[in-house]
């Protein structure tokens, strides 16, 4: 199987703070599969480290009030093209992210509050009917 994975979960230092969300259980489960790592934020041209971003209405804003929507959309489209080119079977994404969150995302207040919703990249994967699992599902914790 070909599985698209948020690169931060595999140990790539691509999070906003320059770190990662390495998940040893995910890495172990993926040993027998073809892994396709992506970080839509980096693909969209955002730096690492960078100012944290959250979805505010229909835009992605950083904590200082800068609009990062174009970079998020660009990165999501590039990552989606990679998913299509590699013909991935499903995706494992980082929860809560404004790009990869699938069931819950931060609410745009930068206070750690969550709301029901999906990030830009998760929405694009859903439009192609690519199944999504979140890194914090019972299977990976």
Predicted regions and their residues:
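Short, surface-exposed acidic-centric catalytic microdomains
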Residues: 21-62
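Extreme N-terminal starter segment of soluble prokaryotic enzymes
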Residues: 1-3
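Divalent-metal-activated hydrolytic enzyme cores
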Residues: 43, 53-78, 82, 113-141
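Short, well-ordered beta-to-alpha junction loops that form the rim of enzyme active sites
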Residues: 8, 94-97, 137
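Short, active-site-adjacent cap segments at secondary-structure transitions
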Residues: 11, 45, 98-101
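Internal, conserved structured core segments that host functional sites
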Residues: 94-105, 109
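Short N-terminal binding/cap micro-motifs at the start of the first secondary-structure element
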Residues: 11-18
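Short amphipathic alpha-helices and their capping/turn segments at secondary-structure boundaries
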Residues: 22-36, 75-90
């Amino acid at each position: 199987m070909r599985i698209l994975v948020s690169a931060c979960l595999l140990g790539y230092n691509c999070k906003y703070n320059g770190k990662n969300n390495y998940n040893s259980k995910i890495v172990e489960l993926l040993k027998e599969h073809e892994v396709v790592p992506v970080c839509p934020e980096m693909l969209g041209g955002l730096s690492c480290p960078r100012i944290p971003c959250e979805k505010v209405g229909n835009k992605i804003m950083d904590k200082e009030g800068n609009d990062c929507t174009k970079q998020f959309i660009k990165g999501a489209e590039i990552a989606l093209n990679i998913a299509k080119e590699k013909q991935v079977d499903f995706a494992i994404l980082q929860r809560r992210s404004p790009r990869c969150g699938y069931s819950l995302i931060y609410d745009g207040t930068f206070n750690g509050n969550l709301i029901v919703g999906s990030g830009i990249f998760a929405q694009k994967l859903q439009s192609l009917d690519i199944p999504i699992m979140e890194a914090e599902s019972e299977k990976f914790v």
